[in-house]
Amino acid sequence: MSGQVTLQSSDSVDITVERAVAERSMLIKNLLEDLGESEEPVPIPNVNESVLKKVIEWCTHHKNDPQSTGEDDDNRRRTTEIDEWDQKFMQVDQEMLFEIILAANYLDIKALLDVGCKTVANMIKGKSPEEIRKTFNIQNDFTPEEEDQIRRENEWAEDR
């Protein structure tokens, strides 16, 4: 079993990384097991070079973390706390943040997906619908009447 693996981004850039780093992705880990020993680059068709490099940076930092067993999922999901290194890592523009989340989902890196989703959750926590729309540049397509109806239907969920 070789110590290195080459990943090929969607824009055809080859990036060589430690196998242990690449195997933080369950997709890549399963692919490597299925392919056996191969010098061929592993194609990652849905992730471009800049996003793949960010994902690899995260995987390198977390390569010695225990893989998620599923049992710790409930505890992990209940909190929106993010460790300091991950918070700094996620200080990127919105487009890159969403690209990282999509890549983590595609590559099946649950812990990175969690960190990305918690980052977004923390961005909207405590904000009004108007503030959330402004944060994410979302157009309001409700009429004032529809907005009033939705507000009445969801009164129970509002913090008072």
Swiss-Prot record:
Keywords: Ubl conjugation pathway. One of its GO terms (biological process) is ubiquitin-dependent protein catabolic process. Residues 101-160 are annotated as: Interaction with the F-box domain of F-box proteins. The keyword Manganese does not apply. InterPro entries: SKP1, SKP1-like, SKP1-like_dim_sf, SKP1/BTB/POZ_sf, Skp1_comp_dimer, Skp1_comp_POZ. It holds the Pfam family Skp1. Signal peptide: none annotated. The keyword Transport does not apply. Pathway: Protein modification; protein ubiquitination. Component of the SCF (SKP1-CUL1-F-box protein) E3 ubiquitin ligase complexes. Belongs to the SKP1 family. Essential component of the SCF (SKP1-CUL1-F-box protein) E3 ubiquitin ligase complexes, which mediate the ubiquitination and subsequent proteasomal degradation of target proteins. Controls sulfur metabolite repression, probably by mediating the inactivation or degradation of the metR transcription factor. This is E3 ubiquitin ligase complex SCF subunit sconC.
